[in-house]
Amino acid sequence: MSLLIALVPMIAWGSIGLVSGKIGGSANQQTLGMTIGALLFSIVVFFVIQPTLTTATLIVGFISGLFWSLGQNQQFHSMKYMGVSVGLPISTGMQLVVNTVAGAVFFHEWTKTKDFVVGFIALAFLVFGVYLTARQDDDSQPKTSNSMLDFNKGIRALIFSTVGYGVYTIIINATGLDPWGIILPQSIGMLVGASFFAFKKVKVDRFVWMNMTTGLLWGLGNICMLLTMREIGLAISFSLSQMGIIISTLGGIFLLGERKSKKEMFYVIFGCIFVILGGILLGYMKA
């Protein structure tokens, strides 16, 4: 059951880039709208579950939310600079490395030699798959490039994004606090952080309100990942959640109209296959 719940973030989070890309708006508008939606989701969950809130839960949740807002804001910027089908796969690969190493090494989630062998093979498959989905055909760049894309700015944004996302998950796993109690203060921290990035920079209009939909998707994926993180560990739960890259990459091409050459489509297909193989290996570890 834990493995099935761990796959919910894959679908929910894998759809966020597509939904926000379809809705439109600036990176700041997308982040602000998303955090408002996540706050509404957490308020409903709080009144339904009625978890106990401690001082530690409030502080850790709030800090986690602040760092998440940094990660998400910079990821939206990277997608503006690099496109969804390129920016999101690279972001996923960077997060996979950080969270897997943290879970396996620092939190001692992998204790046997087999765990490390199978785990790092799975990670290699995932990262290689992510690399293939983001790989570009140099010969076709004049045809497929967009004048608004900037790879260097995108990479800088992704570095900040990875730091933010890394702290968001690692701090919660390190403290072992109740996930149901975490999400409300976490969503408040998210909104505060998003408001900071959007201060005097964002026009609150229909793009903000429509992007609340992505917040509901994020909230669903978030609580499922936090719950499974305690059962199967950070390394595996986070890695499985990032398999949504298949949805975001193919959706970016077929739904958002991001153009790919024949060679790039070849890379994407084989990249998705490697991501799936990596996910199967991770599932085997906890079977």
Swiss-Prot record:
Xref: InterPro entries: Sugar_transport
Keywords, alphabetical: Cell membrane, Membrane, Sugar transport, Transmembrane, Transmembrane helix, Transport
Highest taxon, organism lineage: Bacteria
GO cellular component, as recorded: plasma membrane
Any single Pfam family the record assigns to this protein: Sugar_transport
Lineage: Bacteria, Bacillati, Bacillota, Bacilli, Lactobacillales
Family stated for the protein in its record: Belongs to the GRP transporter (TC 2.A.7.5) family.
Disulfide bridges in this chain: none
Gene Ontology MF term list: carbohydrate transmembrane transporter activity
Protein name as catalogued: Putative sugar uptake protein EF_0928
Residues that span the membrane, as ranges: 5-27, 32-49, 53-71, 84-106, 116-134, 155-177, 182-200, 207-229, 234-256, 265-284
Subcellular localization, as worded in the UniProt entry: Cell membrane
Keyword Transmembrane helix: yes
Membrane topology: Multi-pass membrane protein
